[in-house]
A protein has these predicted regions:
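Metal- or metallocofactor-binding catalytic centers and their adjacent structured scaffolds
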Residues: 1-38
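N-terminal small/glycine-rich loop or linker at the start of catalytic domains
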Residues: 37-64
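Active-site beta->alpha loop and helix N-cap motifs at the rims of alpha/beta catalytic domains
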Residues: 41, 60-69, 74, 91, ...
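A generic structural signal for well-ordered alpha-helical segments
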Residues: 35-36, 157, 208, 234
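Flexible, glycine/charged-enriched surface loops at secondary-structure junctions
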Residues: 3-7, 42-46, 138-144, 219-220, ...
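Flexible C-terminal active-site loop/helix
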Residues: 220-284
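Gly-rich Lys/Arg/Thr-decorated short loops/hinges at beta-loop-alpha junctions or inter-strand turns
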Residues: 52-56, 75-82
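Catalytic core of soluble alpha/beta enzymes
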Residues: 85-226, 252-262
Length: 284
């Protein structure tokens, strides 16, 4: 098949195997890279070209409060203006964590909370309400309840003012459609390793645009190779209003060259064709 037959390639890819979304994403990203190179343009421009910069948060892992405060202050000193705080294991103790971080970093830093499915619906309502009562000004709470509990997540979304972001609950366009239909969450988190790549992620973007639902683009602990593809998608689509693309910043070493530039929490797109990666090391 010729690279210009993008839809044909993607139909064949996604009909070949069930699940295995990370493997599909690897092929998908390579195809989109070649497709954009064929036309001599950066991928984000071919996908829509909404902007050439993406601001990302950085993750602060669960630790004792003093360590989390220190990690947060270090991230702010590095230039990050958005922190994503991991919680979800100790109930109201999580409120103390967020309160300590908010006091340390001040009101000018945006804070997001990721519970990673760690609460029941009732716990989530109690904890998020406590954060609201303390005026902690949380941008969003990510996946407060188990992925399968859409009824519980809908109850949380309805009960609190803080926006709720669905993550593990949304892998496919079908998942996104169900969350939108039932109003189970306010926001959708797109990850290429969940969707199977850019092709399916674009479908989620289109659904979200139709119904006025904003999206975040996220990543696992991924290298610059994979995160660069996600950054191109984020730069292309206005419906993607938030980014959690800190994977390369959390890696000990970056063996790849080329691609978007990472500067103090801002990802800057370049004019390089395709995804922009110019060297991929040989792994042994």
């Amino acid at each position: 098949m010729e690279i210009e037959d993008l839809d044909g390639i993607m139909y064949r890819l996604h009909s070949s195997i069930v699940k295995n979304t990370s493997s599909k994403a690897a092929v998908d990203m390579a195809v989109y890279d070649l497709y954009a190179q064929r036309f001599g343009a950066p991928l984000y421009q071919l996908l829509g070209g909404a902007g050439d910069t993406v601001e990302t948060d950085i993750t602060i892992s669960v630790n004792p409060v003093p360590q989390m405060v220190a990690d947060s202050l270090e991230a702010v000193q590095q230039g990050y203006k958005i922190l994503k705080i991991k919680v979800g294991k100790e109930g109201l103790a999580d409120v103390a964590r967020i309160a300590g971080i908010r006091k340390a970093v001040g009101s000018g830093i945006q804070i997001r909370v990721d519970a990673n499915q760690g609460w029941t619906a009732k716990e989530a309502i109690r904890i998020i309400t406590a954060m609201e009562d303390k005026g902690l000004n949380i941008d969003l709470v990510e996946q407060p309840v188990p992925a399968h509990d859409l009824d519980g997540m809908r109850a949380v979304t309805k009960a609190v003012y803080t926006p709720i972001l669905a993550d593990e609950s949304v892998f496919s366009p079908e998942d996104a459609a169900e969350i939108i239909r039932t109003r189970a969450a306010d926001l959708l988190n797109i990850k290429l390793m969940k969707t199977g790549g850019i092709w399916q992620a674009l479908k989620i973007c289109s659904l979200a645009e139709m119904y006025g639902v904003e999206c975040m683009i996220g990543c696992m602990l991924e290298s610059k190779l994979a995160v660069s593809a996600a950054a191109h998608l984020a730069a292309a689509k206005r419906v993607i209003t938030r980014a959690d693309l800190d994977g390369p910043s959390l890696c000990k070493a970056d063996p790849f060259t080329g691609g978007p530039l990472y500067e103090n929490g801002v990802i800057r797109m370049t004019d390089a064709p395709g995804i922009g990666i110019t060297r991929v090391p040989a792994f042994v």
